[in-house]
Regions:
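P-loop NTPase signaling cores
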Residues: 1-229
Length: 230
């Protein structure tokens, strides 16, 4: 998170393949939550596929989206967070907004940031033809690792030195099949690490991506809860 905030307070994470970007955004959310005691930053994970132009403004949409996690949060409380400059807003899936509402969202987001400039804003998206409309955002392209680079990362990773067989078995699976069967995760440094954590927890990486995605998020949540409890 620190590396991203060093680049800009307004960032677009651009890359192909939907699962990897959403998982990365969830990781940023959980990581910021874990660090809240030290930083004071309050993260909000917002799925843009649910955006509609009939919301009064972006604050109303955000409150609607986060109501399941932040039950009963008021508009006044949200404005107080925004005015403090302690908000991290993770907007997931810009490319999932319908063409009919895209202009409305761009306008609402621009007004939102103009009012509350001191917060942090991260948007994830597939490569999108209209990034040029987001003039204040810095586009960060998610670069893919080659198979050799992914294997090298696993070799260098300090992971469970008490049980080296976990990493060794995962590396073998990565070399034989996982790099290609789970492309989009296996070629991304952060997501590859999450794959290894999932392998440690479940002793395998499921071939069906929706099951793997659920298990990976379960592992992230457990790690977050363990750190929170400690």
């Amino acid at each position: 998170m620190e590396k991203l905030s060093d680049i800009s307070s307004c960032i677009i994470l651009s890359g192909t393949g939907g699962l990897g970007k959403s998982m990365m955004m969830r990781h940023l959310f959980l990581d910021a939550t874990k660090r809240h005691t030290n930083t004071g930053i309050i993260p909000f994970f917002i799925q843009l596929k649910n955006y509609r132009a009939n919301f009064a403004d972006l604050i109303d949409f955000i409150i609607f989206e986060i109501s399941s996690l932040f039950s009963g949060i008021s508009r006044e409380r949200m404005i107080a967070i925004l005015e403090s400059g302690k908000g991290l807003f993770l907007f997931d899936g810009l490319d999932e907004i319908s063409q009919e509402t895209a202009v409305s969202f761009q306008s609402a987001l621009d007004a939102f940031i103009n009012l509350y400039t001191n917060n942090q804003f991260i948007i994830s998206s597939r490569p999108y033809g209209n990034f040029s409309a987001f003039t204040r955002f810095t586009v960060v392209n998610l670069e893919s690792f080659s198979k050799a680079q992914s294997l090298e990362l696993i070799d260098k990773l300090d992971f469970r030195s008490d049980m080296p067989e976990i990493k060794s078995k995962f590396r073998k699976e990565l070399d034989l099949r996982l790099y290609w069967s789970h492309h989009g995760f296996s070629d991304n440094p952060l997501l590859l690490t999450i794959m290894l954590m999932t392998f440690e927890e479940f002793a395998e990486v499921p071939s069906k991506m929706h099951i793997f995605y659920q298990e990976a998020y379960t592992v992230l949540s457990k790690k977050h809860d363990a750190n929170k409890g400690g």
